[in-house]
């Protein structure tokens, strides 16, 4: 039977749902739908931009402001208190006869998994830059995520009203740091009163926004002959020349035209659309969301240049008459239960429709909602290409291993790249009676956030959380209190060290036991070696090959699982063992021996090998960008040197500031934000993100072991 797929986002295994009822399938894509994500570095103005879109589209009656805590998309208590986006949220609004489904995503590195989930559902993205800062650390991260999903994108350079904004530097950053080909459709200009206006390259108009009506209206005036017009005409000619090298239709017109001035605007826009959807160029627009400038033209550009659903996802035509879509996020609502956010790829979903997952679990869609952050408007049906919230799908999301997927799953799966946890800590309920409620809360939070790791430490008997940073862990604790009314205690934050073997080792382990009257016997020879590629391999040397050829594929899979499971917890601090390969030399399995016994023996053999070879610790390293006034740099660098930091570069940042690029061990950065504020008297800013692991010297290793044992 052909399996229609509902594909989940990261760590929420790939799910494909198909319609069981006998219906005639009609392709109902609308060319008027745009599914977009909005991405940015923290504080670039992404949420403010989204709030302006909702306001000008008529979905809200007042302007939402981050600093006032009244935004639509930042609806969690923690988001409004801190002024940052934590969870991605979906909103739907009309604009110029189009329907835009927008996913607002977090900008903080601790919540990058939310970005990854959202990109499963969109056809294009808007990347917001801070006009005073250009391309920043998290901009590079989200750009690479969009690259992985092959998403067309627009650039919106925000905060161009600021005196220190530098549009040319932002464009240069796009070329140098993101290695993309930007095409500037607008340039900033200040009116006589000093207010930001925009010169449009294609239409040769000046756009000025009226602030008396909060930017709802703007006037566009053709530029009179002047230096500004001549410069803009040159920019228009450069744009046409650039696009004609990428688009045959425009090139044919240019060849037959005497002057670039006679090239029709509509022809330029069509060529720009084709080049954008084919990811040959990235259109660049500008404005100031906070000052209500440029937002309507940004929404026009979304409609004009980003693809409709029918222009992507042609691969899913193979499902024929089946209904298919992607499940990209799960949220929990106290009144409605689990809500499933779905991007519909084919067909139409209706309320009451019966669906079945590729794993054979039947579901019934009890209700459908149009998304507006945490507000929901019920609808009866949703067509292909759209985004919808489904209630009633209680078992669609489960945590299954990748190796359980069959070929059809692998064909349509996207590697989620769930980042490794960099911190972990114990979590305890306030009382024994709250244990079950806490476990249920963690289960629901894990469904929403795949980067949250929950495990049980059999040695200490504690529940252990793993997360992306101090802020991530703090938000989890706060959400458990505010949403589930459980005041949990978090233990001290511990660094998520990794381990790697010091030297190769080879051993044989033979185990015989009688369990429930059945004899269980396994003899296995394994070796551990340094290797960054495969975690498990077969030693197909002449002396071992005859034995390996007698082992059934199922037994090899069991041996592989057992061996790899032992690498999850190293002998020194319980860190994951990496850069290590297990080689199977030979194995003898007694008749009637259970798979679980074989798996346990393999794990025990690997643990013995790790103890024999010995392990070294690897500590997580963070890449920091610190911006501070020049006179504060020496004090900051002196403090960094005491933290075992490696200073890579010091660059000028504007007229008065400098930027320090540095790598430092995470273990030395606890509370560093507060320390930096003290050293710089509050004048410095910092961004930080993981950049890999590094080996440690013996003194630092001993200190790390003592910290892991709670002795420091």
Swiss-Prot record:
User: Which ranges form a coiled coil?
Assistant: none
Entry-linked InterPro entries: EF-G-like_DII, EFG2, EFG_II, EFG_III, EFG_III/V, EFG_V, EFG_V-like, G_TR_CS
UniProt key word Lipoprotein: no
Which Pfam families does UniProt cross-reference here?
EF-G_D2, EFG_C, EFG_III, GTP_EFTU
Q: Where in the cell is it found?
A: Mitochondrion
Q: Which residues bind GTP?
A: 40-47, 104-108, 158-161
Return the GO cellular component terms, semicolon-separated: mitochondrion
Please state which protein family the record places this protein in. Belongs to the TRAFAC class translation factor GTPase superfamily. Classic translation factor GTPase family. EF-G/EF-2 subfamily.
Protein purpose: Mitochondrial GTPase that mediates the disassembly of ribosomes from messenger RNA at the termination of mitochondrial protein biosynthesis. Not involved in the GTP-dependent ribosomal translocation step during translation elongation.
Q: What is this protein called?
A: Ribosome-releasing factor 2, mitochondrial
Q: What is the native source organism of this protein?
A: Drosophila yakuba
